[in-house]
Amino acid sequence: NKIISTQYLMEDLTQELAGLEAFLAHLDENSAHVTYNGRMFDVPFIRNRLHYYGNSSSKLAIPHLDLLYYSRNLWSDKLPNCKLQTIEKEMFGLERQGDVPGQYIPDYYNTYLTEGNIGPLIPIIEHNKQDIISLASFLEKIYAEVNGD
């Protein structure tokens, strides 16, 4: 029972295609996307970036489990909203400390690019790590609720 996570760092934007291709190399017939609003954001974003580089890989056409939709179906009547951090707090008692809000992540990365200081990347890495841990917990809880466990 462990989570293995790989995060790719592009030291500059010229490495974007290499990062995307490294991501695709990890996908195989046993892969699935598990996201939170990834159906509307992450997967289309990745697909658009690949398309920009002339790569129309079919590797993104794998099963996709967007937990936002399950969360809305299961908990929207019990919670004030179905934001990831609301569910973390209300369903799991987790409250992120010192987390960088997702909308600021591009600014943190751009600061890294312009200043060459890796400091702004640390909160991004921690944010991503917490997202992954939360999604694994959500998946387990959703599975239990759907199956009556």
Predicted regions and their residues:
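Conserved DEDDh/DEDDy metal-dependent 3′-5′ exonuclease domain
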Residues: 3-90
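Acidic, Mg2+-coordinating catalytic module of metal-dependent nucleases/exonucleases
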Residues: 84-148
